[in-house]
């Protein structure tokens, strides 16, 4: 095989691995909602001591629901809506994070079966609506009286919002004995968290690969929930999508996952061993971004005085995280100078290409050195064509005498794969790229594909007419042609497919990929074209000297 064809195959072998990587990544992450874990920590769960259904008047409950009023609370970052029925949070919108319809992202919304994202099983004891009281601009109480076994209790839910615009809500549960200083008669109650967060519009469902998942963090391990899983004393439990999540933390909690109405719920069991109840839940509801999550690991960084909560562990780290950290830092530096994330991706790409230029130059030089040996190689091939063993021996001898490595041009190309995979993971999951515009009217969101026309439905699995995939395909073809010295006439059918078929194949693979990733790829292709012209000129000048 000629050295140029060997290099060409190495290039497309790299592209093949890239395509497989992206397809597997998309497939595996889309199945997060059904992920399973084998390791379980069991604890004794006696359900007979939960809220007795005989204490619940279902007809009365329906009447209360019909008469419920909405209470709206606004902070700088949240627009929250509570219901006096149950005193529950029924809607939570993030003011600073818009969806594709340019409206605040609604991270919490009432479930279709009229079930809140999270609720307390003690709510079922209430036979009246909760009374709302605003303690101050950040603290809001919902109060009612409940009867348990002939004894009356004051039931209070206190929601405290951050004074420092942190994406955290403190929920305190109080159940105080009014009449008699006696046991409540209930062994435990449940905090129920379902997975129905971030309601997407029809367009959003087509554009975002918005997988849902329950996750739990315990014993320094991040795991995904499944029906029947029980965990004791986790750091937190939560539900999330690609970019947003709701995480719940509480001291000494026990969690059970169970399917109800075809929805996987997480039940936080809270033991009642006192005459009164006083429990505290910390609920993170916001972006899946370490910038907002990690402040709860150090007491001095958050207004709630929390430490070592480990919310940031919900953001999964890839094997190439050590490469992504400096890349993200470089992007941030460029963004601070020119506040455009699209340009930051382009500048990052140029920096990366400059850093790996020695590898690229070495690869091309190895190819050029092999090209010089073509006449001698052909002589050996003709002379020993009937003796494969002797042919290989003579070829090896020629390489040693000339000081040439026949695969020296392939390794530098393959060594660049980790860099691409790291960039892919960064661009595909970097939260700040969500909603970040590059060219208004064309590339309005770097986290999804570009669009010049939106169909409103799928046409052969496509939802939009996009331009970037066409540019990527053309520049990829030009880059491959410039990088090779092979004459088209000398190419066989297999090599011609590598030249023309692979870019077309990747056009379909990458069609719906985030525009930020395609900007990286296109910039790489253009830089490679210019780089190869420079290398050819440099080597030509050396030969002429």
UniProtKB/Swiss-Prot annotation:
Sorted UniProt keywords: Cell inner membrane, Cell membrane, Chaperone, Membrane, Protein transport, Transmembrane, Transmembrane helix, Transport
Name this polypeptide is given: Membrane protein insertase YidC
TM region(s), chain numbering: 10-30, 319-339, 341-361, 407-427, 467-487, 502-522
InterPro entries, alphabetized: Membr_insert_YidC (IPR019998), Membr_insert_YidC_N (IPR028053), YidC/ALB3/OXA1/COX18 (IPR001708), YidC/Oxa/ALB_C (IPR028055), YidC_ALB_C (IPR047196), YidC_periplasmic_sf (IPR038221)
Quaternary assembly: Interacts with the Sec translocase complex via SecD. Specifically interacts with transmembrane segments of nascent integral membrane proteins during membrane integration.
Molecular function GO labels: membrane insertase activity
Pfam name, any one: YidC_periplas
KW Cell membrane (keyword) present: yes
A GO BP entry: protein transport
Gene coding for it: yidC
GO annotations of cellular component type: plasma membrane
Compartments where found: Cell inner membrane
């Amino acid at each position: 095989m000629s050295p140029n064809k060997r290099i060409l195959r190495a290039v497309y072998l790299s592209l093949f691995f890239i395509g497989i990587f992206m397809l597997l990544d998309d497939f595996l992450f889309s199945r997060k909602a059904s992920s399973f874990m084998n390791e379980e920590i069991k604890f004794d769960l006696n359900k007979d001591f939960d809220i007795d259904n005989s204490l619940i008047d279902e007809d009365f409950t329906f009447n209360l629901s019909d008469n419920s009023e909405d209470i709206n609370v606004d902070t700088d970052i949240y627009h929250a809506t509570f219901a006096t029925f149950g005193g529950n949070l029924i809607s939570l919108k993030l003011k600073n994070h818009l969806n594709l319809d340019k409206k605040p992202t609604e991270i919490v919304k009432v479930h279709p079966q009229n079930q809140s994202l999270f609720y307390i099983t003690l709510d079922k004891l209430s036979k009246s609506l909760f009374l709302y009281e605003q303690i101050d601009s950040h603290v809001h109480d919902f109060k009612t009286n409940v009867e348990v076994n002939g004894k009356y209790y004051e039931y209070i839910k206190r929601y405290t919002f951050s004074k420092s615009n942190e994406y955290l809500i403190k929920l305190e549960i109080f159940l105080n004995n009014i009449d008699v200083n006696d046991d409540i008669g209930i062994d435990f109650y449940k905090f129920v968290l379902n997975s129905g967060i971030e309601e997407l519009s029809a367009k959003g469902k087509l554009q975002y690969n918005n997988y849902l998942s329950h996750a739990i963090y315990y014993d320094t391990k991040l795991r995904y929930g499944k029906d029947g899983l029980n965990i004791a004393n986790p750091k937190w439990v939560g539900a999330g999508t690609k970019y947003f999540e709701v995480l719940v933390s509480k001291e000494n909690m026990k969690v059970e996952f169970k399917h109800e109405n075809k929805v996987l719920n997480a039940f936080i069991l809270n033991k009642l061993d006192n005459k009164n109840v006083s429990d505290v839940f910390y609920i993170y509801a916001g972006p899946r971004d370490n910038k907002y999550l990690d402040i709860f690991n150090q007491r001095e960084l958050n207004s709630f005085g929390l430490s070592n909560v480990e919310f940031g562990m919900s953001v999964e780290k890839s094997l190439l995280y050590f490469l992504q950290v400096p890349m993200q830092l470089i992007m941030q530096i460029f963004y601070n100078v020119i506040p455009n994330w699209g340009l930051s991706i382009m500048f990052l790409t140029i920096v990366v290409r400059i850093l790996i230029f020695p590898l690229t130059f070495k690869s091309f030089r190895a190819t050029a050195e092999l090209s010089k040996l073509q006449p001698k190689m052909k002589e050996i091939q003709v002379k020993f064509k009937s003796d494969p063993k002797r042919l290989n021996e003579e070829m090896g001898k020629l390489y040693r005498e000339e000081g040439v490595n026949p695969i020296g041009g392939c390794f530098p190309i393959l060594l660049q794969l980790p860099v691409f995979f790291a960039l892919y993971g960064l661009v595909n999951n970097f939260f700040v790229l969500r909603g970040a515009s590059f060219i208004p009217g064309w590339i309005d969101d770097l986290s999804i594909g570009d669009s010049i026309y939106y169909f409103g439905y799928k046409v052969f699995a496509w939802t939009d007419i996009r331009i970037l995939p066409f540019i990527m395909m053309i520049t990829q073809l030009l880059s491959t042609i410039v990088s090779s010295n092979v004459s088209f006439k000398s190419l066989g059918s297999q090599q011609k497919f590598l030249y023309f078929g692979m870019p077309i194949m990747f056009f379909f693979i990458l069609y719906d990929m985030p525009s930020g990733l395609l900007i990286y790829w296109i910039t790489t292709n253009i830089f490679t074209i210019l780089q190869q012209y420079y290398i050819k000129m440099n080597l030509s000048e050396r030969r002429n000297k």
